Amino acid sequence: MEKIDLLSLTLKEIEEILTNMGEKKFRGKQIFQWVNKGVKTFDEMTNLSKNLRDQLAERTYITNIKIEKKLISSIDGTIKYLFLLEDCNIIEGVVMKYHHGLTACISTQVGCAMGCTFCASTLDGLVRNLRAGEMIDQILTMQEDTGERISNIVLMGSGEPLHNYDETINFLKIINDENGLNIGNRHITLSTSGLVPQIKTLADLKIPINLAISLHAPNDELRQQTMPVAKKYAIDELIDSCRYYIEKTGRRITFEYALIKGVNDRDKDARELGDLLKGMLCHVNLIPVNNVDERGYKKPSIESIHQFQNTLKKAGIETTVRREMGADINAACGQLRRKHLQN
């Protein structure tokens, strides 16, 4: 019998397992609370009988990832982690320190299949999906290591969250549970390259998380140069799915736009982007591209970035420039894992 990862299960799923074992339903709640506190052995569950702990050990297990490497930025205190999974795969996570608390950036897949040319995470393709428990354990491990509570989550590490849809939705349910990490939906941001059917399915669930769309171009021709997913879903389809999401959830959408020197940073690109997004409940986050040596991409000048931002603002689009975090430790997505794998 294949053992079940308890950390990947919702409270309801654990309760069902316990009642099927002939135990009282409340035992499921106790176990859910234990695993989401970060315990890694059944012996630590001191309010359970030894007989029940032994039965759990026979049928289930608790995901346990390890810190393989850790770098701390001397500039802003950002912490970059390489996590070692139980099958010896490597993923990344980042903790960023803000005045409102700690934000964790976590991975949802080992590698990525999306092929975006400005991202180092996708250079070696997709290895496998992460289980919900492996996503949660990134947060638990970060909390244990820092000694502080993680108050905000961004699903912006390696992988496309909506390409691992079922596990990502389970993860959202588990971390939002008041008996677990109890992180509010409005403190969670999911970033997607734009998988249109999944955006609509997510909208129908009406989970009021923050949705961020990796747009990076104002038209299909330009977007297809950097994002293979754009060949499957036209930009008009993507924008329609975003409008549907806003209609269903009432939540503002963030459009992420990686500014690449000489590729998508021209004034005409800014004007076209303003026209595309006009009238939407949205916000544009400009991201000066991180240098990816394999692609030869460079970030634009400060003047070009501000000019692009001002053009969007004149079009009535709320626009910010993302603050660079952990620049001295290669905290950008995919950079550290790739360097580790090459050594």
Curated annotation (Swiss-Prot):
Annotated EC: 2.1.1.192
InterPro entries: Aldolase_TIM (IPR013785), Methyltransferase_A (IPR040072), RlmN_N (IPR048641), RNA_MTrfase_RlmN (IPR027492), rRNA_lsu_MTrfase_RlmN/Cfr (IPR004383), rSAM (IPR007197)
Keyword Metal-binding appears in the UniProt entry: yes
Binding-site residues, [4Fe-4S] cluster: C112, C116, C119
Any GO BP: tRNA methylation
Gene Ontology cellular-component annotations: cytoplasm
Catalytic residues identified in the record: E92 (proton acceptor), C333 (s-methylcysteine intermediate)
PANTHER family recorded: 23S RRNA METHYLTRANSFERASE, RADICAL SAM CORE DOMAIN-CONTAINING PROTEIN
Protein name, entry field: Probable dual-specificity RNA methyltransferase RlmN
Organism: Alkaliphilus oremlandii (strain OhILAs)
Gene behind the chain: rlmN
